[in-house]
Amino acid sequence: MPSAVVEEKINSYRPRVVERLASAGEMLAARQEMGGNTPGNVPPWPGSSDADFHGSLAAVWVWSRAQQVLGDDRFSLNIASAWNFIESSWAEFIPRTLGAHASDEAAYDCAMVLRAWLAGGAHSIDDESARREHVVQAARLLGAYITDLDDLTGREFKDPGFLVWTLGDYARASNDRGLGATARRFVEAAFGMKSPPPFASEMPVRDGLFDFSCTTATRVLAVIGAEGPIPFVGAWLRERVASALPQAFVPRPMDENTWNACAAATLGYAFSVATDTTFFDAYKSLMDELDLRAEVGSLGRTTGFSGETSATFYYAMATASILGKI
């Protein structure tokens, strides 16, 4: 497709992206704790005071992306406070190794450290800073975890697609060839370049507490993360992935808003790489429904739930993805 047509479609969404990210940022800023025992923490839902490590990192991602599209620094205090919370509570959430003793969420926590760092332009921070040391530690832990990962059936916090996608993006941004090779080896062995199954055929979680990650979508993101948004990957998306895209919002018994937002984030980003209207049309179909379900930039896990930090993060990713920012 001619680049002018692609730009026209992307730019048609730009005002909506600015509005949604600004609203999501304001909601999360209002939720953030600025005093008490955990200053800087962003609790997972209204009325909660739980310390939420990856939720606070998700908020950093939203605020950072919002500032980029707004062209100002209105959330800079929120970002700094959230990073202070992350650094002060690091030992509580991030173990020395991601072995059997680590929590089920530890690998995801490491990945979210990297996603927040990537979104915020924090790679300009001095390599000797404590934050940079924590980012490097999270990357090394995640790389070792992925190297030893045999179970490809993980969902939610253990979704290998999300973890490898994040590691690949980080490796490219930090020019870490070793971690980049780790991501590529995993993708080649676990996923390859075969056609994924239809997104809508993905089985729901039956016995868990969450079903927020569309693992078919994150597998696609893992390939893009490992290889980069290059023409070869664009051809793969057009030839092998386009036929698997959902044609409408996919009903799910649990976390259907977040699951569809995860899928939409992949479709929007893939459109910027593949430049094929099949991806744009599928993206628009999901986003039209998600926009109806969202309230002032905030999204609940499913119908009837109030705005939740994680669901809002995935909705914000979906919103921004059409600009190639994810």
Where are these regions (language model features)?
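The feature captures the catalytic groove of carbohydrate-active enzymes
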Residues: M112-S129, V136, D150-G154, K158-R172, ...
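Terminal, non-catalytic domain-edge segments
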Residues: M1-M27, G47, R65, V69, ...
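Non-membrane alpha-helical segments in proteins
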Residues: S48-V69, D109-A119
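Glycine- and aromatic-rich loop/turn segments at beta-sheet edges
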Residues: L21-D50, N84-A106, H134-G161, L179, ...
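Short, charged, amphipathic alpha-helical segments
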Residues: S76, A80, A181-R184, K284
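Residue-level detector of extended alpha-helical repeat arrays and alpha-solenoid scaffolds
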Residues: S56, S76, C110, P160, ...
